[in-house]
Amino acid sequence: MALTDESLRRVGSSASEVHSESVVTAETSATGLAFQERTAPSQAVGRPNLPTENLPRRTPPLLWVSLLLSAAVLACRALSPAIISLPSLTPPPEASLISTGEGMLARLDRLGGTPCPESDFICVTLTVPLDHLDPADGRTIEVVFAVLPAGGDRRGMFVTAVGGPGGSGLAVADTYTAAFDPSITEAFDVVFFDQRGLGASGGQQCVAAAAANYGAEYDPLTAAGETELALDAERFARDCPAEMGNPDLLPYLGTEQAIEDLEVFRRELGDDRFWLYGESYGTQFAQTYAAKYGERLAALILDGPVDLTLSGFEYYAEQAAAFGEVLARTLSACAEDEACLGDMGGDPLQAYDSLAARLRAEPASFEFPLPSGRLAGRSFTFGDLEAGAASYVYSEGSRMLFLRALAASTRGELAPLARIAYDSLSLDPETLAPLVDPGWSDAVSFAVECNDYDYGPAETYLRAGDAVDASVPRLGSVFYGDLPCSFWPEDGFDPGRPEPLVAQGVPVLVLVGTADPATPLPNARRIVERLADSYLVVQEGGPHVVFGWGNACVDNLVTGFLVRDLRPERETSCYGTVIDDYVPLPPADAADFADPLEALASAETEIAYLPEYFYWDGETPFAVGCAFGGTLAVEPSPTGEAYTLSGCAFSRGFEMTGTGAFDYESAGSRLELAVAGLRPGELVYNRDGDGATRVTGEYGGESIDLSR
């Protein structure tokens, strides 16, 4: 489905071995100033039609972000003995090599492999049939695969199909792989690819059409709103193919064609069988491949799976309900946290519903701090609220960020929610112009969806949404994400739904979180029930797509399954949470800080929680307007990151001007600042890699030397 994939940055961390005792106690500890991991919520569905963007998920930059919070101890509790060792899931090692004995580097060289840009991977461009299903059609298309050869004794090939549809595998290959246990990259040639039509495999885009589509506002609960919704979907279905530049590709971008490209790649590499991992939409791809070429799979991993037997209407109805439920669970988790509840000033669910009702009635005017230092008059709408809410319920970290922004709104500050909305809608916060992400394609996203699913005419789609509108109180508009398919060109045939996946002779590991809004838990359970050799791993709470986030239970089960042929019990439960530990908002007035050390530590935390920084790529310089005036600029440095502050204030009365740095090697940070406001001063702030802080200098006419 066109799932609003998080594809989510993950912090790769070494994980302890999963224990084989009957029960492993599930405990966690997490304290500190900031957050444990940087996640990237996707461009999500919060309006009737929002970007379904698949962003990089495993973290490159800002190691200090995770260092500010003590690492949580993520344990695993199996329903019965956690791991059992069975005979090898794969043929003997030599069977995975091509018959000529040719090594991987030699194979890649034979296929014209070259280094992928700014990557450790080797890129191979294959020319494949445009229409695999019609041998008489001689047209071709190029598809790019990226391979990281095994670092040790080769076991075989491990292929990842990323989420979307529309997400680039090449764009995330290095960051995903950094989160793997080293034993995976030692044993496997790791493979990612750009699906036909997107990124390096075609570059098809429709950025302007998508921006217009996602920026439209209407209420599907009213007749007039339904009319506008349908008109906008029709307009997008016309404008997107026209903008993409090669609309003739549209009939050939579906999953049924795309899996044939992978099969061509397998044949060219010469492996008889390989290991396939799919996440979110990638599970749609992986199951389609497994249904046709199951004999070519040594094992299959489905993370955040889609039940392909459901119709589009059935799937989206279940998904819309899940989005609303995860939002409610997020708000309930806030109510159980003293600091979050205090910041919210009352019941968090009521805070959200009250704001939503107010914005439904009338957009709210507010001033947004620009990177230039000026304030811009802006309007915050109900659609903006839903965009941010839907986008930011994908992971524990993003849910906590949304709660902080919602709490700020209860004290009259809408700019934090606006930052989240702009990030969710891929808008430049200063100009509100659409941002181009080369790792994502709306054109391919809808082309795949509209090839894979049949919805019939728009009226049928809208009437199918009536039950959702009546039963889902929050974020039900997610249901309408595929409405453009009712108008999509080259549509008009019903692909039908596939038979349930059998995967005879293929062990299947299925992963899911109980707080997954995009691919709700029932999908995974139904898939597992139909498979004879399948194993379900359920993380309590957790994100959408659970492998690679640093949860030792989940990651070790996957690593053992891949590297050591270890199969878990039929169902295993792993510890997890709905939200990361809540970090309180700073006081609005600097007079409420105990001392300048507390003020500077708070400022460092606030920088970390800016969405522009939270999802920074670590390479592109950027600037933001600070909450109470001034600006902050961030850029990479030879040893880490460099900051420039100019009158920047996150609390009234504590304006900071100067420079700062974060050093990747030591994991320490430093700020050298002149401060103004309540008291003038010249301060130097240091935080070491262990989290100890110190400030020295002069403040309010007095020398200070404070440490904690």
Regions inferred by a protein language model and the residue ranges of each:
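Long, low-complexity segments enriched in small/aliphatic residues
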Residues: 415-453, 458
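Structural motif
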Residues: 368-387, 394-398, 433-443
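Bacterial N-terminal signal peptides that target proteins for export
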Residues: 55-63
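Gly/Pro-rich cap/lid or specificity-loop segments adjacent to the active site
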Residues: 93-384, 447-449, 453-708
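Bacterial N-terminal signal peptides
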Residues: 64-75
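Ser/Thr-rich, Proline-interspersed low-complexity disordered segments
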Residues: 23, 29, 52, 76-100
